[in-house]
């Protein structure tokens, strides 16, 4: 079932008018309803709202999703190019040609500290090309030019360690030890002197280290730039601005008898209806959301309202044992949910969302980023520019990853663990909608205006 277009007629209308009206930080003006979404969409039941109808630029849609514009100039990130090192080296002195060999593995030249390299004669006489395939230090197979000299990985690593750690060596013999593939590790002093004699440059190692340092600094700058474009501080502010003041209710309701006569399904539906109003207020505080076309704003809210609400009450319920805490301040115990016939989906919420959030101590900034990822869904049907929405989602990803690395450096897998909650959230959201449709169908559960409109909106099956 595709639930992406579940914003009902009047609800979408209210969304539109809210999207076009400025908001204050302190209070929220009650949105008004409009009888239709546009051609082909009718509202059975003719639900009425006490709030006056506001005009909207889309197909006669009127109020609840107002959005304040929050233009932010795009920030570009520059990735510096890595400088290349160029070193000219003289070819080693060549003498005493040997018989030709078929492989460099067969080469065992007696290389001494004097740097004389004995290699076979090359039929073409192009000795420079031949020396590229062997290490100028020990005669092993060369992996390329390192610090100015063609050398193997072993000699390259030895020279780099020596320079970076500023090591000093002593020779036990006459400082003229044979350095070849088999004996290169016997005398570090002579091996290092051979590296210098063949042209390896200490400054090249230092420059390489500086480039690595510059890359790390650029990564930090890129992280900072990503956060400036989608600041997690503003996402947190959005969460705090619409957070229900349930703290005063928690203790009073924690002791509720699990067999309370209050119908948990009714309580949940009433809380959802209440939260639909604040969902608009939250969305327009998310960076760049209000810069999208009004039609796209409505589509995105239609597509994600159920997952957005479930994520909120799941995180709010972290401190609750075997139950969830609703926006109305009511505590619904799992036993009550089982008695009402919704125990299976209720248990999934507790185990796949609430418990996981509790175990990792998910904070409100992370919750807000996950909800913003849900909001910016480029797969929502009917978007005028899905690529733009996808770009905004990518910015949230980048900001969340940077936040996790900065706030929880000892948890390198935290970002991935957060994203793993999204598939569960999606699956649970779809199942909850199935239950809501069932309750609406049998008609024995009071469903308030806003939520009813959401369920009456046209939808598509997937």
UniProtKB/Swiss-Prot annotation:
Region of interest (Hinge), residue spans: 201-224
DNA-binding region ranges: 135-200
Spans annotated as Nuclear localization signal: 160-165
Family, per entry: Belongs to the nuclear hormone receptor family. NR2 subfamily.
Region entry Disordered, spans: 1-107, 206-228
Cross-link (Glycyl lysine isopeptide (Lys-Gly) (interchain with G-Cter in SUMO)) at residue(s): 108
Binding annotation for Zn(2+) 1: 135, 138, 152, 155
Induction: Down-regulated by aging. Induced by pulsatile shear stress.
Modified residues (N6-acetyllysine): 145
Subunit structure: Homodimer. Heterodimer (via C-terminus) with RARA; required for ligand-dependent retinoic acid receptor transcriptional activity; association with RARA is enhanced by pulsatile shear stress. Heterodimer with PPARA (via the leucine-like zipper in the LBD); the interaction is required for PPARA transcriptional activity. Heterodimerizes with PPARG. Heterodimerizes (via NR LBD) with RARB. Heterodimerizes with NR1H4; the heterodimerization enhances the binding affinity for LXXLL motifs from coactivators. Interacts with NCOA3 and NCOA6 coactivators. Interacts with coactivator FAM120B. (Microbial infection) Interacts (via the DNA binding domain) with HCV core protein; the interaction enhances the transcriptional activities of the RXRA/RARA and the RXRA/PPARA heterodimers.
GO cellular component, one term: cytosol
Main localization (coarse): nucleus
In-chain residues carrying the UniProt-annotated modification Phosphoserine: 21, 27, 56, 70, 129, 259-260
Cross-link named Glycyl lysine isopeptide (Lys-Gly) (interchain with G-Cter in SUMO2), sites: 4
Domain-related comment: Composed of three domains: a modulating N-terminal domain (AF1 domain), a DNA-binding domain and a C-terminal ligand-binding domain (AF2 domain).
Stretches for region Modulating: 1-134
Designated name of the protein: Retinoic acid receptor RXR-alpha
Originating organism: Homo sapiens
Residues of the NR LBD domain: 227-458
UniProt: all-trans-retinoate binding residues: 316, 327
């Amino acid at each position: 079932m595709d639930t992406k277009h579940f914003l009902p007629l009047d609800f979408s209308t209210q969304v539109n008018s809210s999207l076009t009206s400025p908001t204050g930080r302190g209070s929220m003006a009650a949105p008004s309803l409009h009888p239709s979404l546009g051609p082909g969409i009718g509202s059975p039941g003719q639900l009425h709202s006490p709030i006056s109808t506001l005009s909207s630029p889309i197909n006669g849609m009127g109020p609840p999703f107002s959005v304040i514009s929050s233009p932010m100039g795009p920030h570009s990130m520059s990735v510096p190019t890595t400088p290349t090192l160029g070193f000219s080296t003289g070819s080693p002195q060549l003498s005493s040609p040997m018989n030709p060999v078929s492989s460099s593995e067969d080469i065992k030249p007696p290389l001494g500290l004097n740097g004389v390299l004995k290699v076979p004669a090359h039929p073409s006489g192009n000795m420079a090309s031949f020396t590229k395939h062997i290490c100028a230090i020990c005669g092993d197979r060369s992996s390329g030019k390192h610090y100015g000299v063609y050398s193997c990985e072993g000699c390259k690593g030895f020279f780099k360690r020596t320079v970076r750690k500023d090591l000093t060596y002593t020779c036990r013999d006459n400082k003229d030890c044979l350095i070849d593939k088999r004996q290169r590790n016997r005398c570090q002093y002579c091996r290092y002197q051979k590296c210098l004699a063949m042209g390896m440059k200490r400054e090249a190692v230092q420059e390489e280290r500086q480039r690595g340092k510059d890359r790390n600094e650029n990564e930090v700058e890129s992280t900072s730039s990503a956060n400036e474009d989608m600041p997690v501080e503003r996402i947190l502010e959005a969460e705090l601005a619409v957070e229900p003041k349930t703290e005063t209710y928690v203790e009073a309701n924690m002791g509720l008898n699990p067999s309370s006569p209050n119908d948990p399904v009714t309580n949940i539906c009433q809380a959802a209806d209440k939260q639909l109003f604040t969902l608009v207020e939250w969305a327009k505080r998310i960076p760049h959301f209000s810069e999208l076309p009004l039609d796209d704003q409505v589509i995105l809210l239609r597509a994600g309202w159920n997952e957005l609400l479930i994520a909120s009450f799941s995180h709010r319920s972290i401190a609750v044992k075997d139950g969830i805490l609703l926006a109305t301040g009511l505590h619904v115990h799992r036993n009550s949910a089982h008695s009402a016939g919704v125990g299976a989906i209720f248990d999934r919420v507790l185990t796949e969302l609430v418990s996981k959030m509790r175990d990792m101590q998910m904070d409100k900034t992370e919750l807000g980023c996950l909800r913003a990822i849900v909001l910016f869904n480029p797969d929502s049907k009917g978007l005028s520019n899905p690529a733009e929405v996808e770009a905004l989602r990518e910015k949230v990803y980048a900001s969340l990853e940077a936040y996790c690395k900065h706030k929880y450096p000892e948890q390198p897998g935290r970002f991935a663990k957060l994203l793993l909650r999204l598939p569960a959230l999606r699956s649970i959201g779809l199942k909850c909608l199935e239950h809501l449709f069932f309750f609406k169908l049998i008609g024995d559960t009071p469903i308030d205006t806003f939520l009813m409109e959401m369920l009456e909106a046209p939808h598509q099956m997937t």
